[in-house]
Amino acid sequence: MKIVLTPNPYRDRNFKHVEQAVSILQQSGVETKICLPFDVDRNFELPGDMNFCDLNKEIKNADILICFGGDGTILHASKIATRYHVPILKLFFDECFI
């Protein structure tokens, strides 16, 4: 099984939620790929220790997409996921949760 995770880097700046999900899924033997659902601003620094994959490439053979963020994040990710009929699980985090 392959799961693609798409975090919103502006909401979860240190990616702690997606890293927790990756850890749990990989312990269960699931292949995971972290992909950004949209391009980030030029001045925004992404963590150098994380490997971000191309969503357009990874979604093609994914079993599910887990989207971390709000409505805008899921709209970006769903544009690509629906082309390949990949189901989407949305996990919403409001400001007080992060």
What residues fall within each predicted segment?
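Small-residue-rich beta-alpha loop regions that form the catalytic core of phosphotransfer
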Residues: 10-13, 40, 50-98
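ATP/NTP phosphate-donor binding region
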Residues: 1-64
